[in-house]
Swiss-Prot record:
Keyword Zinc in annotation: no
Annotated compartments: Host membrane
Entry coiled-coil feature ranges: none
One GO CC annotation: host cell membrane
Protein keywords: Host membrane, Membrane, Transmembrane, Transmembrane helix
Source organism (scientific name): Acidianus two-tailed virus (ATV)
Protein name: Putative transmembrane protein ORF119
Membrane topology (UniProt): Multi-pass membrane protein
Length: 119
C-alpha cells in the first residue's frame, strides 16, 4: 500500500534529504567550484586574446578522469571540460554519492506523492 500521504511521509522525506545532502554536498561543492573557477579563467583568457593565437605550443592537461593534449590557447576551455567530466564522473563512480543520488530522487518522488494527494 505504501506510505500514507501525511506529515509522516514528509518527515521521512526530509530526514532522508538531510542525510543524503550531508554526503552529496561536499563532492558537489568541490566539483562546482572547479567548474565555476574554470568558467571565470576561460572568460578572462578570452577577453585577453587579440584574435590570433600567439603560440602553438601543446599543453598536457590531466586529472583523475582523463588526460588530453591541446594547443595552449584552448587550455582553459579544456580544463573546464575536464573538470566537468570529473565532476559528473565522481558522482557516478563514487558508490556513496550514487546511492545518495538515488535517495534524493526517491525523496523528490515522495514529495510529489505527498503534494499530489494534498490537492
Amino acid at each position: 500500500m505504501g506510505l500514507a500521504p501525511s506529515l509522516a511521509t514528509l518527515a521521512i522525506a526530509l530526514v532522508f534529504l538531510g542525510i543524503s545532502l550531508i554526503f552529496l554536498v561536499p563532492a558537489m561543492v568541490q566539483g562546482l567550484y572547479s567548474i565555476v573557477s574554470g568558467v571565470f579563467s576561460v572568460a578572462s583568457s578570452v577577453s585577453n586574446e587579440t584574435g590570433c593565437p600567439q603560440s602553438t605550443e601543446v599543453v598536457q592537461l590531466s586529472n583523475q578522469t582523463a588526460s588530453i593534449s591541446v594547443p595552449s590557447q584552448y587550455a582553459g576551455i579544456y580544463t573546464l571540460y575536464l573538470s566537468f567530466i570529473s565532476f559528473v564522473g565522481s558522482i557516478f563512480t563514487d558508490p556513496i554519492a550514487l546511492i545518495m543520488l538515488i535517495l534524493v530522487s526517491l525523496i523528490i518522488t515522495l514529495f510529489a506523492f505527498y503534494y499530489k494527494n494534498q490537492g
